Amino acid sequence: MLPEAVKTYIHTHRQEAVDTLSKLIGFPSVATPQPQDSFPYGKPAAEALDFMLEQLSALGMTCTNYDYHMGAADWDDTLPPHLGILCHLDVVPAVQANWTSDPFTAEIRNDRIYGRGAIDDKGPAVAVLYALRAIKAAGISLRKNVRFLLGCNEENGSTDLAYYLAHAAMPPQVFTPDGSYPIIHLEKGMLRLEFTKQTADPIVRFSAGTAPNAVPADASVSLSAAFCGTAEQGSQITCQGNKLAYKGVAAHASTPESGDNAITGLLTYLGSDAAFADCKALAQLFPHGCTDGSGLGIACADTESGALTCICSMLHVENGMLTGCVDIRFPVCTTKEAVLEQVQAAFAAKGFRCEARIQSDPHHTPKDTPFVQDLLAVYEEQTGTKGECIAIGGGTYVHDIAGGVAFGMEYPDWDYHMHGDDEFLPLEQLEENTCMMAAAILRICGE
């Protein structure tokens, strides 16, 4: 059980933690694509890192700044790091006009703190900070060293993590509170592919998809000839002369079954006209409503990681050049090499060229490792509910860290508007998560 002195400190310093999080939200730390002001991810991200390292240094921890890519704070630098806790201080952009309040000025409403980064991932970083403060204030010694890692580019490719790994080793046990409870222990592998072909289909322009990792909600096409297809138009398709459009439903590439792919819907309609041979071929490779890769011959599944998912996420035709994007999330029962070989063969058979742009192996930390079992025990102790490992199609900050897992801070069945408008974190959950982080540190590194 969490010592009373630790719980009391966390409870009595709750407002202080809220104030710290408010200050941290105040840094508009959207990582810049290019270095700015001599900082790799821009000045606001650097200022956010400086702010957190100042807090940790004042706590007596030994801090290292890895050239503003990542910061590290060691509890006891005379010992090798045993537990790594990985958070990030960069955030995704916010459209201020869509928010009820300024996304970079924290606001308390309805016992929640609103602001960009409240749940992803500044709130978790503050929870870890105050967990460490509570342990220190309670006079508790740790027999193993904790290294608190704070990155500045998780949202844009995790180059911060790559930079750190080029200069220092990762602790043998690592978790990130940049995911969901109870524990994310398995993340599917990913392939992102581009396919191309010079098409003879009578298309002036085809436009669909703006993100490679999302089911597109809209697709439109301008034709150079009258459409003579036999397919039923359906309510999703609108026609204005030689212009057609399909209205679908957006979804993340890791959960495509919750969407309605506008690309495949429009391809199926166009493919009913014999003049649109390439559209018909693509409709066969990506049957509308199919998300398991059957059309490409790659459907597979296993009990632990679930089924493969596959979407055509972007498709554009301009001056006769057809270019598209495919996002595939595959389970641990197959390999990226096997999937890529089959996909390229399927495209080649239809006359398309296909090349891989991103390749990532699955990430899997076995459920029965002592580290995972320790964290599950902490979750059960703190929440009173059964802890289970979960698998996801997306990726977390520890995807490329052997043995790493995501542990919090999102509770099941909560929508925190992460990456959306009015992102928030309930104040009560900030306190609960601080207790969770403290309990995890003490179980793994305590006496």
Question: What are these language model-derived features?
Answer:
Residues 56, 64, 256-311, 316-319, ...:
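An extended, acidic, His-containing surface patch that forms the Zn2+-binding/catalytic region
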Residues 9-16, 20-27, 51, 55-59, ...:
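Generic non-transmembrane alpha-helical segments
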Residues 2-113, 140-142:
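Acidic/His- and Gly-rich active-site-bordering loop/insert found
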Residues 26, 30, 104-106, 249, ...:
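Short connector loops/turns at beta-strand edges and beta->alpha or beta->beta junctions
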Residues 62, 81-150, 156, 421, ...:
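Active-site metal-coordination/substrate-binding segment of hydrolases
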Residues 94-108, 190-192, 196-197, 238-246, ...:
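Acidic-glycine-rich active-site phosphate/pyrophosphate-binding loop
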Residues 155, 161-331:
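Midchain, well-structured core segments that form catalytic/ion-binding scaffolds
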